[in-house]
Swiss-Prot record:
It is found in: Nucleus. Its main location: nucleus. CDD domains: FH_FOXP2 (cd20065). This is Forkhead box protein P1. The lineage of its organism: Eukaryota, Metazoa, Chordata, Craniata, Vertebrata. The gene is Foxp1.
């Protein structure tokens, strides 16, 4: 039995060595196990060589099994890779099929397919046909299309839009041809006439202008047609025809012709004004300044953006002053004279760059323009009043000059307009320079210099307060409502008195009463100007509350609140200073006062080159009569004051004129306080407004709540 099992193992080992399968090896192992399970002792008769041989056979069998497993794994991996490649190829084929289907659909949508219904091709046919072969349809063809009823309403609308666009193109082409013919005729006429080189330059500029307009219109039409073809531009039933729509953004042919006429007339006006350099007519200078603005605007390559002509007014003004640097009202002596700017610019191009960058169209510049408009309106009103006053003074002095001791030459040689203009230019320091007041020499309009003044030179306190009240106009709810957003955003001092602002704050409250902190909050909420320098203006608010009789302090649950007594507020009307004997009594003597006034008047008239008051004509009897009339008026006022001194009321004692006038005694209101300032006083007056200017000479009374 042992020999048979050994022979079996040998035969099985040889079979494994010869490349037999792993199944035979398993059978061999099973046979060995069977022999061992029989209970016999197999290891007794086996030698060491047999055991080594058996071990080698087992190792060889394991190696063969491993090789088989590796081969199976490699085959599986190859199969997976092949499957992935097949899937990728299928996906690519599907994508190609989808693309082909899309192309076929696009081709089919462009053609009229009989298999589909009439609605689907009806929406696409006119657009594709118009893109391929745009042609104008005659009325007969349109009637045939309507009779056959082949097209749907949407398709008819698209077709009409395309036809209108084509008609517009034809109209533009005809207009362009006419314009080119006119240009050629004008060029031929100028060449035959043998005009100056300057006129030839103007003609070339005009030609370039026309070419640029044509290019702009063509680009605009192409853009609109592309939008229409893509379906982005449609026409509603209530809208006008298409030929007027694209030109509404730019210019219609009539506007182009009008602009062409303006350019030609402006250039001719420029030639006429250039020959008359000595003329000072304002209209001619305006025309000459507008002509280079248009030409430079057209020739500027940056003046057109996105095919549209930019006609912004500040740009035109800045370009118009490139050829006239000395005439720009916002530039002088190397400084930008925009209100509140005063930036130093080395030359005029630097100023233009600064003007376009710093003072562009934004909220801050708009707010400054609004404030400047208010300042100009107030100054115009003041100028009208001063002109009336000056006319009355001139009439009165003319009557005085007809007396026997006066000169035979009448005083009306100097017109009231000339005198008012020269007088206003004589004292530029009296112009109230707020942060938004222009610093350019634009003929500052001030209160006219008073020839017969009734203000004492020693009472500087009341004069300064009167000057401040003259500028601060009375407040009204309409003024705040109109400029509410402006005052909230712009750091501009409101042109109102503190008393008027406090009254407005109290009246706007629901209970018609406010605490001090609530008044502060109203100031900071309504005006951006009061959000800084709180200590200064809060001090002025406390002064006004404590010193005005119209503000009444009431104790309640909250503490101390302030209310307004309207009766007392309406009583705040100043009396004419000419009727106050206490103020007139404290004036200086007529000779001491008339000497500096006469000198200031002579200096102002001499600076303005008025023939009647020049240094050469100082010996004129008219000036002497004027001075004598001034002395007579002053002497009469002094005598009247001395005679009526005993009749003065206790509240108007002479002691009040020595000290600054208390507001409770004479609160001045801007509507009636029209007494003009003297030249000496206004020259010494600082133009900058202090926040507590109204009561700066009085003690501070702080209300602690």
């Amino acid at each position: 039995m042992m020999q048979e099992s050994g022979s079996e193992t040998k035969s099985n080992g040889s079979a494994i060595q010869n490349g037999s399968s792993g199944g035979n090896h398993l059978l061999e192992c099973g046979a060995l196990r069977d022999t061992r399970s029989n209970g016999e002792a197999p290891a007794v008769d086996l030698g060491a060589a047999d055991l080594a041989h058996v071990q080698q056979q087992q190792q060889q069998a394991l190696q063969v099994a491993r090789q088989l497993l590796l081969q199976q794994q490699q085959q599986q991996q190859q199969q997976q890779q092949q499957q992935q490649q097949q899937q990728q190829q299928q996906q690519q084929q599907q994508q190609q099929q989808q693309q082909q289907q899309q192309q076929q659909q696009q081709q089919v949508s462009g053609l009229k397919s009989p298999k589909r219904n009439d609605k689907q091709p009806a929406l696409q046919v006119p657009v594709s046909v118009a893109m391929m072969t745009p042609q104008v349809i005659t009325p007969q063809q349109m009637q045939q299309i309507l009779q056959q009823q082949v097209l749907s309403p949407q398709q008819l609308q698209v077709l009409l839009q395309q036809q209108q666009a084509l008609m517009l193109q034809q109209q533009l082409q005809e207009f362009y041809k006419k314009q080119q013919e006119q240009l050629q005729l004008q060029l031929l006429q100028q060449q035959h006439a043998g005009k100056q080189p300057k006129e030839q330059q103007v003609a070339t500029q005009q030609l370039a202008f026309q070419q640029q307009l044509l290019q702009m219109q063509q680009l605009q039409q192409q853009h609109l047609l592309s939008l229409q073809r893509q379906g982005l531009l449609t026409i509603q039933p209530g809208q006008p025809a298409l030929p007027l729509q694209p030109l509404a953004q730019g210019m219609i042919p009539t506007e182009l012709q009008q602009l062409w006429k303006e350019v030609t007339s402006a250039h001719t006006a420029e030639e006429t004004t250039s020959s008359n350099h000595s003329s000072l007519d304002l209209t001619s200078t305006c025309v000459s300044s507008s002509a280079p603005s248009k030409s430079s605007l057209i020739m500027n390559p940056h003046a057109s953006t996105n095919g549209q002509l930019s006609v912004h007014t500040p740009k035109r003004e800045s370009l118009s002053h490139e050829e006239h640097p000395h005439s720009h009202p916002l530039y002088g002596h190397g400084v930008c004279k925009w209100p509140g700017c005063e930036a130093v610019c080395d030359d005029f191009p630097a100023f233009l760059k600064h003007l376009n960058s710093e003072h562009a169209l934004d909220d801050r510049s708009t707010a400054q323009c609004r404030v400047q408009m208010q300042v100009v309106q107030q100054l115009e009103l003041q100028l009208a009043k001063d002109k009336e006053r000056l006319q009355a003074m001139m009439t009165h002095l003319h009557v005085k000059s007809t007396e026997p001791k006066a000169a035979p030459q009448p005083l009306n040689l100097v017109s009231s307009v000339t005198l008012s203009k020269s007088a206003s230019e004589a004292s530029p320091q009296s112009l109230p320079h707020t942060p938004t007041t222009p610093t350019a020499p634009l003929t500052p309009v001030t209160q006219g210099p008073s020839v017969i003044t009734t203000t004492s030179m020693h009472t500087v306190g009341p004069i300064r307060r009167r000057y401040s009240d003259k500028y601060n106009v009375p407040i009204s709810s309409a003024d705040i409502a109109q400029n509410q957003e402006f005052y909230k955003n712009a750091e501009v001092r409101p042109p109102f008195t503190y008393a008027s602002l406090i009254r407005q704050a109290i009246l706007e409250s629901p209970e018609k009463q406010l605490t001090l902190n609530e008044i502060y909050n109203w100031f900071t909420r309504m005006f951006a100007y009061f959000r800084r320098n709180a200590a200064t203006w809060k001090n002025a608010v406390r002064h006004n509350l404590s010193l005005h009789k119209c503000f009444v302090r009431v104790e309640n649950v909250k503490g101390a609140v302030w209310t307004v007594d309207e009766v007392e507020f309406q009583k705040r009307r100043p009396q004419k200073i000419s009727g106050n004997p206490s103020l007139i009594k404290n004036m200086q003597s007529s000779h001491a006062y008339c000497t500096p006034l006469n000198a200031a008047l002579q200096a102002s008239m001499a600076e303005n080159s008025i023939p009647l008051y020049t240094t050469a004509s100082m010996g004129n009897p008219t000036l002497g009569s004027l001075a004598s009339a001034i002395r007579e008026e002053l002497n009469g006022a002094m005598e009247h004051t001395n005679s009526n001194e005993s009749d003065s009321s206790p509240g108007r004692s002479p002691m009040q004129a020595v000290h600054p006038i208390h507001v409770k005694e004479e609160p001045l209101d801007p509507e009636e306080a029209e007494g003009p300032l003297s030249l000496v006083t206004t020259a010494n007056h600082s133009p900058d407004f202090d926040h507590d200017r109204d009561y700066e000479d009085e003690p501070v009374n702080e209300d602690m709540e």
